[in-house]
């Protein structure tokens, strides 16, 4: 297979389809989503068989249990896919909305209209559910998309692509609006991220090594995040009960997510009141604590053990595991400084009853999501009321934070006049 030609053909078809999608009605887009949901329900056995072949190859290659779990298309995952499609169909369609319409002294009206980005390339790893999640959001937001999933899920992704195409066709929309790269050749990724004539944005969903590679090589703009080094700062004016609940949930609700707390900062004035209880809670849940000298002193006196001395590297590490870095800070100045120095600009939270300090934290912490008296685990499109998300961005341009339908659109200026000319 000539990869360059194959990918160029995908791009050309996607660009053509994107023009039809930009003018597609809400009713047609919703009909396509419902048709895909029905097709998945009807072809569940076919999808399971395709997934079984993917799983067999993955096991033969020696992939670990965690990888196999991500790759598995369970009955629950199939149900979630169907529910997700219908949830996206129920979301308000942002395309065509005109906002900020203002009369100008010249007689014209100037506003902004929300429009699709165009063609979105999505690169992801072993989760077949991403194929449906991404296709649904791109479809509803009026975009065409090229999906490049992990080679280990190729059989399942190809089967899903057929069902998506069927749904688009039934709704009178071009099947080329959602295309799956049907080759495991890694050169396809290299080509996709350089096709500036056909692809408007790349959304990578995967591990740090994948994102880092794409950041170096992509010529197409990206919506992405590299790390999720999230902090909770317990202020010396915190409610202790709230602090315990927030810090417990932020770390132990799920260990392997990008919005999980990786560093706990505690104000010196409250450390003796909150750290012993937190230390015992974490040790009961077998969380390894990597502590600075001040935190070690408080925790040792409380009988919390074992403890590991933190290094400079710990403040910069996304563990994605039951490991937590703990540091005692002098106060809010120290906490904000630490977060802006070592954090990844993803999600950070303060626990405090002091309104002025809370507002200062919100203003000065340079992150995509900043929270007061709430767990970092809330940094999620569904929890934010976006209905769904295609990913989380910690960049500052275009989309920041959880990226839902609006994040897959842009604004263009529209001018309404009555024959006016500029004087």
From Swiss-Prot:
GO terms for cellular component: cytoplasm. One of its GO terms (biological process) is L-proline biosynthetic process. Pathway: Amino-acid biosynthesis; L-proline biosynthesis; L-glutamate 5-semialdehyde from L-glutamate: step 2/2. The keyword Oxidoreductase applies. One of its GO terms (molecular function) is glutamate-5-semialdehyde dehydrogenase activity. It is found in: Cytoplasm. It comes from the Bacteria. Its EC number is 1.2.1.41. Coiled coil: none annotated. CDD domains: ALDH_F18-19_ProA-GPR (cd07079). Keywords: Amino-acid biosynthesis, Cytoplasm, NADP, Oxidoreductase, Proline biosynthesis. It catalyses: L-glutamate 5-semialdehyde + phosphate + NADP(+) = L-glutamyl 5-phosphate + NADPH + H(+). Catalyzes the NADPH-dependent reduction of L-glutamate 5-phosphate into L-glutamate 5-semialdehyde and phosphate. The product spontaneously undergoes cyclization to form 1-pyrroline-5-carboxylate. PANTHER family: DELTA-1-PYRROLINE-5-CARBOXYLATE SYNTHASE (PTHR11063:SF8), GLUTAMATE SEMIALDEHYDE DEHYDROGENASE (PTHR11063). Belongs to the gamma-glutamyl phosphate reductase family. This is Gamma-glutamyl phosphate reductase. It comes from Paraburkholderia phymatum (strain DSM 17167 / CIP 108236 / LMG 21445 / STM815) (Burkholderia phymatum).
